């Protein structure tokens, strides 16, 4: 029963549908088609567009997976845990910025590498700012 239905669609209904389509013989003939003609062509054009997309999809560039899944990519990788200890009383300046994005070339001091990191990843990380309170 199912195979008979599929056979009928392929052998009878599909050829009848294709014969009724208003396909012009020249490219210029497409400009003379009416709105109702375009509406009758729409299902066929949709199927052809879908088949074309499915055909070229394997050749389209893949979306890049975010390689920044690790936070610390290169700083002190030989240590199981990176810890930097800074004595606050030794602060010479009134403001000191420390890196929290792990991209700074002057780690642990921030060199504003987080700006590029935020643009690439959509992250919103910023530095840790220590201010010396002057009494």
Curated annotation (Swiss-Prot):
TM region positions: 38-60
Main localization of the protein described in the UniProt heading: endoplasmic reticulum
GO cellular component: endoplasmic reticulum membrane; mitochondrial outer membrane
GO BP field: autophagy of mitochondrion; regulation of autophagy
Disulfide bonds: none
Top-level taxon: Eukaryota
Location(s), subcellular: Endoplasmic reticulum membrane; Mitochondrion outer membrane
GO-annotated molecular function: 2 iron, 2 sulfur cluster binding; metal ion binding; protein homodimerization activity
Topology feature Cytoplasmic, residues: 61-135
Cross-referenced InterPro entries: CISD1/2, FeS-contain_CDGSH-typ, FeS-contain_mitoNEET_N, MitoNEET_CISD
The keyword Ribosomal protein appears for this protein: no
Binding site for [2Fe-2S] cluster: 99, 101, 110, 114
Note describing how the cofactor binds: Binds 1 [2Fe-2S] cluster.
Topological relation to the membrane, as annotated: Single-pass membrane protein
Protein keywords: 2Fe-2S, Autophagy, Endoplasmic reticulum, Iron, Iron-sulfur, Membrane, Metal-binding, Mitochondrion, Mitochondrion outer membrane, Transmembrane, Transmembrane helix
Lumenal topology ranges: 1-37
Cofactor: [2Fe-2S] cluster
Pfam family, one: zf-CDGSH
Primary role: Regulator of autophagy that contributes to antagonize becn1-mediated cellular autophagy at the endoplasmic reticulum. Participates in the interaction of bcl2 with becn1 and is required for bcl2-mediated depression of endoplasmic reticulum Ca(2+) stores during autophagy.
Family membership noted in the UniProt record: Belongs to the CISD protein family. CISD2 subfamily.
Subunit architecture: Homodimer.
Name of the protein in its database record: CDGSH iron-sulfur domain-containing protein 2A
Organism: Oncorhynchus mykiss
